[in-house]
């Protein structure tokens, strides 16, 4: 038989469509599209991409075009909140808290966006409004051990192999010792502190919610090919999924994330049709421009369409200061492009 080539899971029309969206909306970041049913990677776009005609310039460019941003670790922010929501649903908890706009933990003040009080908040409303105070108190109620367990169940803190010799970074989870400090537990509860994750890990987490609570590890190799004939020689097998949350709780969580898009912080994520579910995130990086403005990682992660999701999508704009488009608006453009691609 001839030499072996490989067939990737990347769909050419989807990849091209997503590349076009990325080129017109972001200067630095990435967009990922997974097939919800299998977790196969259908598109992975990292911006800026390097210029193959001029590698020397690309190597010296300040915007690091050689980084595959989908596989690098970043501060996560509020896109982590569904992990707490899932842990709460699995524990049979749906508490109601009064949000005053700020929570004091261990002498530290943690504010909601703009310090706006949300009043009486239950779990769906906390996701919809992205209420930090609610998730801090939910984290206290769940406790450090069950939060860490939930994060690990969803694939955080461990390297994510996509193919032989090709993996997403493990990122970082806080240690139990760190989380023994109530301030650190509060930070972790809304996706800040020492938590780091790759966009591919965030995609796998949201895919679990979209796929009825079953975690499947994303992959990029579909089959080996006979290079002479171009025919598949062997379809590569992938580990079976493992259940992380019940199908019922996954459906409840999906409904909450659809509500976030319908009437919450992510209303510009709604594409032309089919509805969607998802979550915004703004993560502080601790890095500042010369003018003193903090650079943030702006996230949007979700699934499309709302009923029977076909695709799980993650958008990250890294180190952003002023952006022309929100992550949610870019997500909506991706949904429209997926619809057009068929």
Can you name each region flagged by the protein language model?
Residues 35-78, 83-317:
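Beta-lactam-recognizing serine transpeptidase/beta-lactamase-like catalytic domain environment
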Residues 1-56, 95, 145-153, 270-271, ...:
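Periplasmic/cell-envelope proteins involved in peptidoglycan metabolism and beta-lactam response
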């Amino acid at each position: 038989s001839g030499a072996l080539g490989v067939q990737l899971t990347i769909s050419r029309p989807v990849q091209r469509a997503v590349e076009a969206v990325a080129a017109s909306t972001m200067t630095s970041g990435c967009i990922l599209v997974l097939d919800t049913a299998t977790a196969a990677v259908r598109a992975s776009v990292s911006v800026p991409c390097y210029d193959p005609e001029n590698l020397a310039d690309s190597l010296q460019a300040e915007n690091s075009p050689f980084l595959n941003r989908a596989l690098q670790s970043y501060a996560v922010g509020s896109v982590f909140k569904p992990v707490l929501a899932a842990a709460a649903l699995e524990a049979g908890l749906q508490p109601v808290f009064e949000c005053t706009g700020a929570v004091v933990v261990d002498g530290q003040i943690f504010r909601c966006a703009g310090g706006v009080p949300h009043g009486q908040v239950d779990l769906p409303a906390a996701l919809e409004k992205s209420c930090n105070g609610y998730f801090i108190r939910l984290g206290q109620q769940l406790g450090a051990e069950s939060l860490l367990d939930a994060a690990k169940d969803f694939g955080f803190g461990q390297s994510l192999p996509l193919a032989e010799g090709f993996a997403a970074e493990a990122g970082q989870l806080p240690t139990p010792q760190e989380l023994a400090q109530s301030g650190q537990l509060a930070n972790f509860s809304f996706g800040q502190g020492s938590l780091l994750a790759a966009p591919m890990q965030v995609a796998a987490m949201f895919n679990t919610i979209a796929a009825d609570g079953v975690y499947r590890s994303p992959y990029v190799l579909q089959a080996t090919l006979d290079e002479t004939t171009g025919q598949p020689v062997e379809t590569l097998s992938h580990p079976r999924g493992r259940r992380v949350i019940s199908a019922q709780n996954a459906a409840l969580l999906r409904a909450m994330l659809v509500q976030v898009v319908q009437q919450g912080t992510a209303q510009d994520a709604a594409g032309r049709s089919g509805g969607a579910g998802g979550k915004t995130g703004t993560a502080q990086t601790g890095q500042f421009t010369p003018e003193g403005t903090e650079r943030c990682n702006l996230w949007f992660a979700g699934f499309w369409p709302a009923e029977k999701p076909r695709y799980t999508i993650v958008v990250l704009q890294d180190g952003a200061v002023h952006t022309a488009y929100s992550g949610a608006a870019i997500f909506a453009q991706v949904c429209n492009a997926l619809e057009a691609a068929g």
